[in-house]
Each structure stands twice: as structure tokens, then as C-alpha cells.
Amino acid sequence: MNWLEERLPGIGKVAEDIAEHPVPSHTLNIFYCLGGLTLLAFLVQCVTGLFLALYYKPTPEAAFASVQMITNEVRFGATIRSLHHWAANLMILLVFLHMLRVYYTGSFKKPRELNWLAGCFLLVLSLGLAFTGYLLPYEQLSYWASVIGAETAGSLPVVGATMKIMMQGGIKVTAEMLSRFYVLHVMILPLVTIGFLVAHFIMIRVQGISDPM
């Protein structure tokens, strides 16, 4: 730390402020840890997703075979894929529980409305990550689930038809849909999610944790 302090004056104070920042006593229970646990699940997915991306091939001909290879041939591949899968399921559950806690305790009220909106966007992004990731194994279950998702989007008024074509890359499910979902899942949605997470935590730090009801 002294080496860093000599080259980046003030970094020690920043680290100390982060590590020793006091929190209200009423937050010392599991219900106030749901947001942090959600972040942990997201980080697990980021790390395991990087390893999975090393072997996954986003083409209709090779996607399923590459997933099978990861599961059956790559060392610890089945473990990494299972961690990614269960962390994804757990993250969705934790996001809903976290938002229920925030709503029940009234933590979304003034002056924290913007942070509540950021949390709502994070919920949508989490569902988007789950949906786009579901297609990637490109098996029968994931294929038809994606077809249903595209048809559901297509039923929306005004913008539905355009959304459906954008999702599918045409009038029906094609290889374009797999490549688009892959880019969304591994690049666009994670980066947007990280941006909203940074904003979310900055607002928590500035405004503090809300008082109990």
C-alpha cells in the first residue's frame, strides 16, 4: 500500500473510507444482504461465463456440440457450467427478493426514487440475460422457448412486429437469432448491467441506507 500511496497519493484514504464506512445497525440481517448476494451471483456468472466463452461456438451447427464438449470433455467444464446455470437462477430469485424487501420497507421513497428506477432497469436486464442465455445451448427446449419469446414480443402493439424481426434476424428463427442473442448475452447486456450497478452503488453511497419502517 505504501508503494501505491507514493505513486497515487490519497488512494489509501479512499480504500480506508470504503473498508471502514459505517452502516446502520438495522441492516445487520439477511434481508439487507440480498442486494450484495445478487451482485455475488452476477460476478460468479461473469467469471464462469468467460471460461465458457473460450469453448462455446455460436453457430447452429456447432453450438449444441460445443456445449456437450464443455460438459463432457473440458476439465471442470461440467462444474463451471453448473455454477453458471445455478448462479443465473439464484440471481433472478435474489433480484425479486431484494426488490420485495425494498418495497416492503419503503426504501424506494423520496429521495431514493432514482435508485429504485435503476433497480427496476437492473431487474429487466437480469431477465434479458436469462432469456438470451437460454437459447445458447441450441437444443430443442431452448430453441422453442426462444420462438415463444419472439412470438410474445411480436404480439406487442405498434412495435411488436419490428421487435420480433430484430430478435430473429428475419421472419423466422435463423442463425442470426443465435448470433444476436450471443452478442447480447456476453457483451451488450453485461456492460449495460455493470453501468447500472455502478450508478446503483454510487447512489447508495451518497444517499445512505434507508431507515427502518
Swiss-Prot record:
Q: What is this protein called?
A: Cytochrome b6
Where does it primarily localize? membrane
What is the recorded function of this protein according to its Swiss-Prot or TrEMBL entry? Component of the cytochrome bc complex which donates electrons to the photosynthetic reaction center.
InterPro entries in UniProt: Cyt_b/b6_N, Cyt_B6_PetB, Cytb/b6-like_sf, Cytochrome_b_N_euk/bac, Di-haem_cyt_TM
**Family named by the database record:** Belongs to the cytochrome b family. PetB subfamily.
**Binding site residues for heme b 1:** 98, 200
Where heme b 2 binds, per the record, is at 84, 185
For this protein, the parts annotated as crossing the membrane are 30-50, 88-108, 114-134, 184-204
Which UniProt keywords are listed? Cell membrane, Electron transport, Heme, Iron, Membrane, Metal-binding, Photosynthesis, Transmembrane, Transmembrane helix, Transport
Q: Signal peptide: which range, if any?
A: none
A Gene Ontology molecular-function term? oxidoreductase activity
The cofactor(s) it depends on are:
heme b; heme c
According to the UniProt record, one GO cellular component term is: plasma membrane
Q: Does the keyword Endoplasmic reticulum apply?
A: no
The listed locations are: Cell membrane
Native source species: Heliobacterium mobile
Remaining remarks = Heme 1 (or BH or b566) is high-potential and absorbs at about 566 nm, and heme 2 (or BL or b562) is low-potential and absorbs at about 562 nm.
What Gene3D superfamilies would the database entry show? Cytochrome Bc1 Complex, Chain C
Q: How does it assemble?
A: The subunits of the cytochrome bc complex are a Rieske Fe-S protein (PetC), cytochrome b6 (PetB), subunit IV (PetD), and a diheme cytochrome c (PetX).
Q: Provide the cofactor note recorded for this chain's UniProt entry.
A: Binds 2 heme b groups non-covalently with two histidine residues as axial ligands. Binds one heme group covalently by a single cysteine link with no axial amino acid ligand. This heme was named heme ci.
Work out whether the entry's keyword set contains Metal-binding.
yes
HAMAP family, alphabetized: Cytb6_f_cytb6
The membrane topology term of the UniProt record is: Multi-pass membrane protein
**Name of the gene encoding the protein in the UniProt record:** petB
Tell me the organism's taxonomic lineage: Bacteria, Bacillati, Bacillota, Clostridia, Eubacteriales
Q: In Gene Ontology terms, what is a biological process of this protein?
A: photosynthesis
A Pfam short name? Cytochrome_B
